[in-house]
From Swiss-Prot:
Gene: recR
Any one Gene Ontology BP term: DNA repair
Family statement: Belongs to the RecR family.
Organism of origin: Rhodopseudomonas palustris (strain BisB18)
Keyword Membrane belongs to the record: no
Keyword Acyltransferase on entry: no
The entry's keywords: DNA damage, DNA recombination, DNA repair, Metal-binding, Zinc, Zinc-finger
Protein purpose: May play a role in DNA repair. It seems to be involved in an RecBC-independent recombinational process of DNA repair. It may act with RecF and RecO.
Ranges annotated as C4-type zinc finger: 60-75
Protein name: Recombination protein RecR
Residue stretches making up the Toprim domain: 83-178
Cited NCBIfam families: recR (TIGR00615)
UniProt GO MF annotations: DNA binding; zinc ion binding
Length: 201
């Protein structure tokens, strides 16, 4: 029987860190050691930030974003265009669009995409709330900012069908050549989409 490498408290820390995305047991062990070595500079502030997150962070009742206020700062920002709702699968996608300063409207977070293989159906997503928001007279466009995967496209088609009676314009993000991309390295699907969605120069 192998001897314990660390005490139970440290092993518990390692096990919890290993549950984070992208951290396996070995990476979690290294992260735990780093935190312990930097106890005052890193571990204590991290513990404090986690406690604040537990106490204050909540899900926005309007769009599904996470924030310390409810409704969130995006929903209450008067500079946002209330006529546009940008639909994303999860909060990470919302953050990506915000970092790029790519969206001027408000958001709606579905929580995931439809994925029959993973057991994710329409009832698991925030689709009913989106349809209700689309019927607001202020709303004129729904932008489907979903991944260009099979699940993302399936979700986009499903939502588009539901929004037909709302009388809003439904658009989706363009797919094509990335900035700095070389054609020789792109897959056929991306090249085909880029050709179909070409614009005037």
């Amino acid at each position: 029987m192998a001897a314990a490498v660390a005490g139970p408290e440290i092993e518990r820390l390692i096990q919890l860190l290993a549950k984070l995305p992208g951290l396996g047991p070995r990476s979690a062990r290294r992260a735990a050691l780093h935190l312990i070595k930097k106890r005052e500079a890193l571990m204590a502030p991290l513990a404090s930030a986690l406690q604040v997150a537990i106490e204050r962070i909540q899900v926005c009742k309007v769009c599904g974003n996470i924030d310390t206020q409810n409704p969130c700062t995006v929903c209450t920002d008067p500079r946002r265009d209330p006529s546009i709702i940008v639909v994303v699968a999860d909060v990470a996608d919302l953050w990506a669009l915000e970092r790029a300063h790519a969206a001027s409207g408000r958001y709606h977070v579905l929580g995931a995409t439809l994925s029959p293989l993973d057991g994710v159906g329409p009832d698991d997503l925030s689709i009913d709330a989106l349809v209700a928001r689309a019927h607001d007279p202020q709303v004129s466009e729904i932008v489907l900012a979903l991944n260009a995967t099979v699940d993302g496209q399936t979700t986009a088609h499903y939502i588009t069908d539901l929004l037909m009676e709302a009388g809003v314009k439904v658009t989706r993000l363009a797919h094509g050549v990335p900035v700095g991309g070389e054609l020789d390295y792109l897959d056929e699907g991306t090249l085909s989409a880029a050709m179909r969605q070409r614009t005037l120069f």
